[in-house]
Curated annotation (Swiss-Prot):
Cellular compartment(s): Cell membrane
A Pfam match: YjbH
Gene source species: Escherichia coli (strain K12)
Record's keyword terms, sorted: Cell membrane, Lipoprotein, Membrane, Palmitate, Signal
Assigned GO CC terms: plasma membrane
Cited InterPro entries: YbjH
Lipid modification (N-palmitoyl cysteine), residues: 19
Thylakoid listed as a keyword: no
Signal peptide, first to last residue: 1-18
The name this protein goes by in its record: Uncharacterized lipoprotein GfcD
Transmembrane spans: none
Principal location class: membrane
Amino acid sequence: MKKNSYLLSCLAIAVSSACHAEVLTYPDPLGSSQSDFGGTGLLQMPNARIAPEGEFSVNYRDNDQYRFYSTSVALFPWLEGTIRYTDVRTRKYSQWEDFSGDQSYKDKSFDFKLRLWEEGYWLPQVAFGKRDIAGTGLFDGEYLVASKQAGPFDFTLGMAWGYAGNAGNITNPFCRVSDKYCHRAESHDAGDISFSDIFRGPASIFGGIEYQTPWNPLRLKLEYDGNNYQNDFAGKLPQASHFNVGAVYRAASWADLNLSYERGNTLMFGFTLRTNFNDLRPALRDTPKPAYQPAPESEGLQYTTVANQLTALKYNAGFDAPEIQLRDKTLYMSGQQYKYRDSREAVDRANRILVNNLPQGVEKISVTQKREHMAMVTTETDVASLRKQLAGTAPGQSEPLQQQRVEAEDLSAFGRGYRIREDRFSYSFNPTLSQSLGGPEDFYMFQLGLMSSARYWFTDHLLLDGGIFTNIYNNYDKFKSSLLPADSTLPRVRTHIRDYVRNDVYLNNLQANYFADLGNGFYGQVYGGYLETMYAGVGSELLYRPLDACWALGVDVNYVKQRDWDNMMRFTDYSTPTGFVTAYWNPPTLNGVLMKLSVGQYLAKDKGATIDVAKRFDSGVAVGVWAAISNVSKDDYGEGGFSKGFYISIPFDLMTIGPNRNRAVVSWTPLTRDGGQMLSRKYQLYPMTAEREVPVGQ
């Protein structure tokens, strides 16, 4: 213990003296790097650093006992989240070879780190973190840690409980408060989120130093490990030293190579791939905006001029089925935006097209954006102000554009104007990739398929929509069973998923939807048919979303029957009502955050609430987590305790060369069970009314 006390004293002196050091000739540090477990840190131990907001990392680390696969994202400057799969190479997935073959054990877990204090001139940065939440608890633990930079050095000192503190090199200070803090449970219910063991059990001091070498790509690490590895799931691991050393080589701005020597006897290597969701920008090859070239004003709308404007509105400004009308001193334009995610870009292009050829006496341009024939918002622009903006003004004489967003104009009373008719029938063919991680038969299961979809508008409100899925290739032949859980008493509302996806061709959905703009911020829809892969039925939804408000409120009510996986045009005997009241909130103090709370009845007839929190970054990429808590007991629910998941929503135009409003969603659900499961509705009013949200930057 004297040796440990001497070491801790040296670390404390180093941190204290570092506070007075100055940056002289050393290059700027490359910034934080990922630890072995994922998330910013040293090697096995964490530090108090958090990557720049929006940074997303994919990590791999490998040694004799473990492989760590992780992703980490800095959601805010003060919050970081990590998802990890751990391959325990010395243990089998299960003792039944017929069930899981010779696959090694896979453990899944979630970590977070919260900054408590930002680094200043004198004081270090301080953070609290928790490892292995909602997992099996193999690496469960928490820590308090401080980091201070001084020149090319970054010093870290902290205290850990649980796995990272198993060495017990210091008495747990909370034991002085109560004896209950002296002991920690040795097992956990898999999938539970519990803080009942926080700051309990053995505790250890850990620390380390990172050194930014004069050669910019290279960063060195030295840490004192708070773990003794005597109770690892992989077995008792020999530890010749508590000191671990490592190096990080930044091969590119988006890639790190890692090499370390740990426990005095083990080599660890790996890599990190990174990007920043705030910095991503589409490499678009788009048509330029129309130049400001005003033509002489005409008397009324001229057919040839309007025809050219309608063509430009469709192909340059991205408005499908554009329509132009002139009433009094206002020129009205409406259409369905299919091209630009940013509504301001669409309105700007439309204004440029219209202002170049205005009839006499027009003082205002009114642009109404629609979705599925429902009017979303009208942007009114003063013509004189617009002309000044486009013509340019002398330095110091510029004026703000006189423009406002108002409730959508109802032009139906005016009759039809000049327009390009909508193609009522449309179809598409889209490749799909379904993925599953951590299954018993294989760590990675996938299915590549083709979704053939078609839509037909009978009227401006009534839509018929259908899709057929065709399998191209999968490795589902490795399935050894349907994996129906034996530890749950709930109706099998989702756990028959393997039986459904074994079909090579099936009708994914075939439904009729009636959409209605009810006015004053109210929108509604009624629908019926084969609504998703596993359910058919009828339902309706009503949404109230005030214009430019940070909140909305919706309700959906459905009655569904389960489709038969052996013949997906037929049904099983199971049916149920399901529906939710959902509140949506964009907190003004948390830029880009959307919170959703849905309360109601799930498919298994359990009742409860689902909370979904998503962070949208500057690029449009959104990262979200969700959890569903219902009135089902843990015993009835089975492994996992409750449903939860993680997703990333990526705008297509970040991956294409042209503007695009579509998105790709990558989702991860650690374990699919039957509790807390919602109907997967293809059309949902809140995302359909996105134009009613205040544009980013306004």
